Amino acid sequence: MLIPSKLSRPVRLDHTVVRERLLAKLSGANNFRLALITSPAGYGKTTLISQWAAGKNDIGWYSLDEGDNQQERFASYLIAAVQQATNGHCAICETMAQKRQYASLTSLFAQLFIELAEWHSPLYLVIDDYHLITNPVIHESMRFFIRHQPENLTLVVLSRNLPQLGIANLRVRDQLLEIGSQQLAFTHQEAKQFFDCRLSSPIEAAESSRICDDVSGWATALQLIALSARQNTHSAHKSARRLAGINASHLSDYLVDEVLDNVDLATRHFLLKSAILRSMNDALITRVTGEENGQMRLEEIERQGLFLQRMDDTGEWFCYHPLFGNFLRQRCQWELAAELPEIHRAAAESWMAQGFPSEAIHHALAAGDALMLRDILLNHAWSLFNHSELSLLEESLKALPWDSLLENPQLVLLQAWLMQSQHRYGEVNTLLARAEHEIKDIREDTMHAEFNALRAQVAINDGNPDEAERLAKLALEELPPGWFYSRIVATSVLGEVLHCKGELTRSLALMQQTEQMARQHDVWHYALWSLIQQSEILFAQGFLQTAWETQEKAFQLINEQHLEQLPMHEFLVRIRAQLLWAWARLDEAEASARSGIEVLSSYQPQQQLQCLAMLIQCSLARGDLDNARSQLNRLENLLGNGKYHSDWISNANKVRVIYWQMTGDKAAAANWLRHTAKPEFANNHFLQGQWRNIARAQILLGEFEPAEIVLEELNENARSLRLMSDLNRNLLLLNQLYWQAGRKSDAQRVLLDALKLANRTGFISHFVIEGEAMAQQLRQLIQLNTLPELEQHRAQRILREINQHHRHKFAHFDENFVERLLNHPEVPELIRTSPLTQREWQVLGLIYSGYSNEQIAGELEVAATTIKTHIRNLYQKLGVAHRQDAVQHAQQLLKMMGYGV
């Protein structure tokens, strides 16, 4: 819940001097990306901008405090301020900020700018007290904001120092409007206006000018002088002389003498007690100070000029001038030290009553009241956890004694989930083990089941499926039906375990159950996870179309619940890329992989390994080895600088081994084969993939016998576990083994099986990457004209893809080849006496490669009628009548020249 006062522009007060010269400068603010107002405390920055903002509608205001260094809190308030300025135009961003469903501030801002592209009016966003921001991530994100904000948006930043926002660059590009302390300092005329408004007896212009010069036009000093003069403690000029040369850090003594010592004791205590509140309203004041009418007291303090300012148009929320507020808080610690814990407790209770638990926690921590802090956490911690208030929760839990956590195991569980969310898996188990050892009777308690559900999640994340299965089953046996979150976790883990063990049908059923429960209870990240797992399972079973449809449901969920920036989104677009690649939709597959990298742009580069491997797969399928090599350099660098799950390594190794196969790099393959992991089992698609990598490397090295043993065992496992996509891949690799070993009939047999199975999987690119060896076999099958219709169609499609992406494969009939052919002693006499033109040789090569007349015309960029003429001349010179005869003739020529066909 957001505090309204932080989003309210300060009310323009009566008796303030209208800064006409500065307002004139600000009137052109819409021509700049950034308007920067900087000065030490008390120069009137906020007052000036509130005057400028008066009457403007398209403006959002965000007043910062120290707590806004939390990225999630900063994001929530900033987006809320934009919503205020646009009347709720950016609904998607608002939902993402509220639910913390974004990968980083920069990615959230990128989405914001997409939505603002439809907002065409001038727009202003004011951020007050930016000097309070010390978080470098927020600074970097705001630099991104300024670089990419729409042209019609102006950011207005108020700060006591020069913020780290790339100011120099903006200044050089004339995109910065600056107002500093010298311009903010009051002129003689403004000082005279100020005193005329504040003092019952006007002072002479010359006297006013001298006072203004004595304090260098510092607005706070002028206000203190006016206050002192009204209280008749000193003359205005005497006060001015005392303040001359003083800066904000040396005001304490003066404020004690001239303000606190000149109010009655009740007012003094009111000021000191109320100052602990960063913002205040009637209810807070009544509870903290004991005053019966808080609103009336606040208005009275405001009338006395005691540096209190309204924060909203309704006059409900107030705050002290930052300079005076800091002074009062320091004095409160000295003068009311004994009462201070009770004052903070009162503030916490009042904030809780108004529904602001995070503010209440701030005061409970300040009070050092562990019992109050415990009670707040017991009632609100899980809500704060689900809203990603992780740093606040961590600080709170650290403040509680261990005994308090033991008495409330829910808080131990919360602390463990915090660790799990930060991938501190070892610490999770240590914490839970210690708690279970010390909590009496917990093993008979439902809490023990919740512990086990979390432990199961940690175990599966840490690559220990057997332990995860044991713990998940224990949790499900012990958890009551109503404990939905832990039941969702345990069910999901059990489904993932079964997936790892190759029990796909049971795994699919559990993941569907997880999805249903997660949707019912609005646990959207587990709903998304279950859909992703379902898609992977269906892909492994060979049901790629159903996997596609499941992915569509996942994309719909992401859009509806604004989950675009969860890291899980990358998983979804990556498996979509894998599916598109299988179907030879390479441009779409590449775009999907790149979008996955974009989702992870704010994470460590190592997280991008899988998407990078997918990009390399696209390059390999296109036969673009130069691009593949460039990307492989980066992939191998990432592999050497990170720790990865075994299936990540397997996917990365896959593209490396295929590249070595395509380039004939036997040395690299042999070196890799000596050091790579050889899993004990092959009962899921992750392990099947690694063993397939091993077999491919063995085939490249001519180690056909061990490769055949591996592939036959893989096929046996794949058939028994119904891993149909893996079976399809294995058959293709076995085909290459047989082909290279000269076992042509075996090669044809498994290729026919692979083509038949591809009717179910839809595989295209898995055939294409095998290159010319695959093309030669498919040409022969097509020429035999014995394939069933579906397989015939697929074979022709695969051949077209090979020809399109591996054009060097049909370059046998280039000029050098033809010259060598004509000089060969066994060349047919007909070719010697009626030589083909270079164009006719090109056409023969394309016919042999399986191109249709239309495709040949497109390849050579000539009319189809021209191609028909070339073919007629070609047939006449070769003495053939049909295309199949021409293909056989070309095949004989290639064999004569020593090419294996």
Curated annotation (Swiss-Prot):
Family indicated by similarity: Belongs to the MalT family.
Activity regulation information from UniProt: Activated by ATP and maltotriose, which are both required for DNA binding. Negatively regulated by MalY, MalK and Aes, which bind to MalT and block maltotriose activation.
Region described as DT4: spans on this chain: 807-901
Superkingdom, natural source: Bacteria
Region described as DT1: spans on this chain: 1-241
Spans annotated as DT3: 437-806
The protein, known as: HTH-type transcriptional regulator MalT
Ranges in a coiled coil: none
Subunit and interaction comment: Monomer in solution. Oligomerizes to an active state in the presence of the positive effectors ATP and maltotriose. Interacts with MalY, MalK and Aes, all of which negatively regulate MalT activity by antagonizing maltotriose binding.
A GO term for molecular function: ATP binding
SUPFAM superfamilies: C-terminal effector domain of the bipartite response regulators, P-loop containing nucleoside triphosphate hydrolases, TPR-like
One of the Pfam families matching this protein, by short name: TPR_MalT
Keywords: Activator, ATP-binding, Carbohydrate metabolism, DNA-binding, Nucleotide-binding, Transcription, Transcription regulation
Domain observations: Consists of four structural domains: the ATP binding site resides in domain I (DT1); DT3 binds the positive effector maltotriose with a low affinity, and the binding affinity is increased in the presence of DT2; the C-terminal domain DT4 contains the helix-turn-helix DNA binding motif. DT1 also contains the region that interacts with MalY (but not with MalK), and the binding site for Aes is also likely to be contained in the N-terminal portion of MalT encompassing DT1 and DT2. Domain DT3 may mediate oligomerization.
Location of the region described as DT2 in the Swiss-Prot/TrEMBL record: 242-436
Additional free-text comment from the UniProt record: A study on malT mutants has shown that some of them became nearly completely resistant to Aes repression while still being sensitive to MalY. These mutations are located at positions 38, 220, 243, and 359, most likely defining the interaction patch with Aes on the three-dimensional structure of MalT.
Any Gene Ontology biological process: positive regulation of carbohydrate metabolic process
Residue ranges of every copy of the HTH luxR-type domain listed in the record: 829-894
Function: Positively regulates the transcription of the maltose regulon whose gene products are responsible for uptake and catabolism of malto-oligosaccharides. Specifically binds to the promoter region of its target genes, recognizing a short DNA motif called the MalT box (5'-GGA[TG]GA-3'). Displays weak ATPase activity, but this activity is not required for promoter binding.
Positions bound to ATP: S39, P40, A41, G42, Y43, G44, K45, T46
Gene field: malT
Keyword Hydrolase appears in the UniProt entry: no
DNA-binding region residue numbers: 853-872
